[in-house]
Amino acid sequence: MLYQSETIQVSWLKDGIAELVFNAPAAINKLDTKTVASLDKAIASLEQQTGLKGVLLRSEKTAFIVGADITEFLSLFDSPVEKLQEWLNFSNSIFNRIEDLPVPTISAINGYALGGGCECVLSTDFRVASPDIRIGLPETKLGIMPGFGGSVRLPRLIGTDNALDIIAAGKDIGAEEALKNGLIDAVVPKEKLVDSAVSMLEQAIAGNLDWKAARQPKLEPLKLNETERGMSFSVAKGMVMKVAGPHYPAPITAVKSIEKAATFGRDEALKQETASFIPLAQTNVARALVGIFLNDQYVKGLAKKHLKEVTIPEYAAVLGAGIMGGGIAYQSARKGIPVMMKDISQQSLELGMNEAAKLLNKQFERGRLDAIKMARTLSSIQPTLNYAGIEQAQIVVEAVVENPKIKAAVLSETETLVNEDCVLASNTSTIPISELAKSLKRPENFCGMHFFNPVHRMPLVEVIRGEKTSEKTISTVVAYASKMGKTPIVVNDCPGFFVNRVLLPYLLGFGLLLRDGGDFRQIDKIMEKEFGWPMGPAYLIDVIGLDTAHHSQSVMAQGFPDRMHRDYKDAIHVLYDNQRYGQKNGLGFYKYTQDKKGKPKKEQDEQTDQLLATICQQKSNFSGEEIIARTMIPMINEVVRCLEEGVIASPAEADMALVYGLGFPPFHGGVFRYLETMGTAAYVKMAENYAHLGALYQVPPGLKAKAERNESYYSTAATIAVSTGKTA
């Protein structure tokens, strides 16, 4: 053994060939600060070997290296600039030393080689891979860019256009594409990976493969003349700005950095990469996107704990074949859980099956499943007009019309037909679960399971715990939702649960703004372009449906009369009273026609202004700052109340529910990350300017207390001593 640490071993393999093996104690290899420090020492041990002829890098795990340890990022990014630069320089010096070894080097890649893992293999002369690999640089998805030489070596290895495509989009690619563009040199069966890599290394040692020629382009400027350079980068910058937009600076920064470094050799180009990386790492966008990644991992970890407690249902039933019921049945079947879809109408069943067939056909056309899988999936949805066979179901999801009496009757009837340990779940968006449970003999087996429309696209499922719901029931529903490919988040029962409860105050704030003379078109523009919502509030209400929004207002007003009751008619009431229901009937805040693809196209409608003029003050010109404050403060306050009341268990779960359920702008990271960025004291000070507008704008006491103590809702991670990799 030439060198050994907790994560890396270096030993002689044969005939002057040494192997450096990544072998972390955990299930996967990460390039955390400890491993980087170990890699420094491992390379030093190789540099001292006089008989060294070649070096093989490989992994003992099912994946090569999945990337850096993202749990360390927020602490690293909060370091002083000089510390962050020191860490990057130190890390890059290690990969330079791999690249500068006086012998040929090769990486044997299996599984994932992402981020720092990809940058590691780029530093070797050759790369051989198994067919199952995914390799790429996903950093821009985290609001940063490659920092270990990826933006320098990749374009010099595979060409500027190919590299920009991977780096700017944060892409990873498979073995076939990686071989085609030159990122890897060979694809071999997994069982022959190491032998093939050694054989290739022996060819290089013997002089049959020119390893110096393979290495040289990575040390030099890009092979582009001035005209080619201008064309490549101008096209890339235009595409990136169109796709990423102004709120996500990482992709365009990466492109500009590669452009600036195009005429530099490796060492100067790496300095440029570091100079571009550091400002990105210290942006609020990077903190938000890294926060989303960490929160997502946390939420998935909670779901895994539930999975340990129960068996995933193997057969399900869905009651109701409408938009939601049909979508739930499709998603269940698509993910391998056969499902019985029951309705009282043959026409509804046919519509449900047709919708499933249409979605499967789209998957088939995109090459995501073959004809056999498509047919098998469709045949695993059993449409029926009666309950025969429902006793086989381990879980039944009720998705009938949003009427408490009908839902209670259907659930009560179903309970008499299923096994005693069968779990019942109601897909409701507004009806309290504890109320529905009163019609059941086994309320402990019942909970809410709130899907979002369209079911096949929206990642969130709210799992609602009623007063008498058992933990086994919650775990079973979480397991089922996870198997369906969804992100389940458990919330406690209350009117609107979590997502709809916090959405309505946002819409009420919008209504107050209209009452005071705001223009819904300007508000939509500000909330989309400046704040970053996928849809402004008026457009969102049209998509939801004004009838649905009107009903939701009524339910929430009963549940929270002090904040959400309105003793006057607002915009939603007026448009609803005039049969303007939004996209569903072509008239809402906007009017809708169909485009060439048959999709709703939004247009202005003077009649809306005439109707709103009856309840709204004369038009006023609000600033973007005022519009954002007046719509967002009610939502932020309500989210905080939900945490304080225990409706939702943690800031991480709240933020993920907002991002996955409402499309809260990811670059803000969710309400609690947004509060952290602004600072709790600054938020309270801002909100106090609007306190005169009513109860919705009153800051919850817990948030005020945090502001007084200058506390955040997220704890700070341990700081990292970058030179040693030890936590401080």
Curated annotation (Swiss-Prot):
It catalyses: a (3S)-3-hydroxyacyl-CoA + NAD(+) = a 3-oxoacyl-CoA + NADH + H(+); a (3S)-3-hydroxyacyl-CoA = a (2E)-enoyl-CoA + H2O; a 4-saturated-(3S)-3-hydroxyacyl-CoA = a (3E)-enoyl-CoA + H2O; (3S)-3-hydroxybutanoyl-CoA = (3R)-3-hydroxybutanoyl-CoA. Pathway: Lipid metabolism; fatty acid beta-oxidation. GO terms for cellular component: fatty acid beta-oxidation multienzyme complex. The keyword NAD applies. Transmembrane segments: none annotated. Residues 311-728 are annotated as: 3-hydroxyacyl-CoA dehydrogenase. Its EC number is 4.2.1.17, 5.1.2.3, 5.3.3.8, 1.1.1.35. Heterotetramer of two alpha chains (FadB) and two beta chains (FadA). This is Fatty acid oxidation complex subunit alpha. The gene is fadB.
